[in-house]
Amino acid sequence: MWFLVKATFWFSLVLVLLPFLDPSSSEKLEHGPKMEIGGTFSAANEAIQYISAICVEKPDVCEKGAETFVALGHRAREGARIAYEFLNTQFAEGDAAAPDVKVMTGTVTPAESVPSAEATEKAEPAFKRMPVPEHRLDPGPASGK
């Protein structure tokens, strides 16, 4: 879950910083809205603290949020696969334009590539959903002293 949040943050940061590298975009952005960097970071810091406080007060909200991010991650992965296949059909040369049903490198014979039912059961995880670590409270000073 945190990987998706971090990846979204860094991707957004890249999109924000790209116009600084292109001189023609600075002319377009001169007439756009202005912002203060310090105020923006302060607001982001307060938003993170607020969200952290919600997770401590109402853990069920964070649990649902984690489930939502997992579902969005699966959708994003499927979307990336669809985009890859589309780009592969548009820009690949020759016979490579047809998407492969199964990628084969030639190191495994087709008979060996079919997994047995027993091997599949051993390879599957024992849990069905991704475990999410809970927020730990600070131990604070010991009251028994």
From Swiss-Prot:
Keywords linked to the UniProt accession: Membrane, Transmembrane, Transmembrane helix
Pfam families, alphabetized: DUF5330
A cellular-component GO term for this protein: membrane
Membrane-spanning parts: 1-21
Protein name, entry field: Uncharacterized protein R01001
Endpoints of the signal sequence: none
Subcellular location: Membrane
Recorded topology in the membrane: Single-pass membrane protein
InterPro entries, sorted: DUF5330
Bias type Basic and acidic residues, positions: 119-138
Region (Disordered): 109-145
